[in-house]
C-alpha cells in the first residue's frame, strides 16, 4: 500500500438540500453524536449507581465521587469564587473533549480531529470570556482596548479574536497529528508491525496525548475566564 492510499479526509455519508443550500451528514457529525450518546449513557449510569441505597459505597460510587471531587477541586482552585458559575460547563467541556480524543481507541475518527469541532468549542469559551469581561468592566472594556495607547486598539482587538483561534488550533493540531501518524503507520508499514505495536501508539496519541490536550484546553478556559474578573 502506497502513500496515495492514505486517506485523511472527512467523508460525507448523506447529502440533502435545505433552502437551496446543500448540506451533508459527515464523519465528524456521526462520531460527535456517538460521543455525546456515550457521554449521556455514562452520566445516566453514574447517576443511577449513586442514587442507589447501598449499605456501603460500591466501586462505581467511589470512582464517580473521586472524579467529581477532583474536577470540582481543580475548577475551584483556578476560578475561586467564580467557580460555581462555570463548574458544569468546564466539566462537561472537558468530558466531551476527552471522550472525543480517545474515540480513536475504538476505531472512530475523533471529532476533535476536525477544526470545525475545536473552533466551535473555543468559540463557546470565547463568548463566556467576553461576557465575563463586559459584565465586570462594562464600558470600561473600551479603556482596556485602548491600553496602553489608543494606537494599540487594532492590535488589542486582534489579540482578543486570536484567543479562540489559538485554542482551537492547538487542540485540533495535536489530535489531527495523532490521527495522521497512526494512519501512516497502518498504511505504510509492513503487516507484522501492525500487531502489538499500534496498541502503544494508540495509548500515546489517543489516551495520553488526548488527556493532556483535554487538561490544557480546560485550563485555558478557566484561566481566560478568571482573568476577566480581575
Where are these regions (language model features)?
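Selective transmembrane helix interface/packing segments
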Residues: 1-230
